[in-house]
Amino acid sequence: MPATMKRLIRFVLRHVPRRYIQRVVHLCTPVLGLAYAGRGVECPVCGAHYRRFMPYGYVNPRGNALCPRCLALERHRLMWLYLKNETAFFETPARLLHVAPERCFLKRFEKLPALDYVTADLESPLAKVKMDIQ
């Protein structure tokens, strides 16, 4: 199953434009995540448990990378843990312009009452503001 999953993910990432992937991936991965049910790993972003995370990567998909529930990658989980454990980000009033927003953070950041949150990107359908930051 994992080798087949890696080939499927590699094919989709190489041949489907990113803007389309971003619109439907949150509908597909929870179903694919059923194959990863278990208690081996926990995603700190969404709290879901899996036997392991799904593979992810364009050229050589790396195993144990993508959370099927919230779509957090390793870097997203690390950033979440840093913000939660080393900063007052979730409690302190702030304004945040999030350029190239990650789906795993969008709803969570929007729900923070102390955060004035705006997303921006040139092509992403996830962004509220279409912006080129060159």
Language-model segments: which ranges?
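Conserved N-terminal segment of class I S-adenosyl-L-methionine
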Residues: 2-134
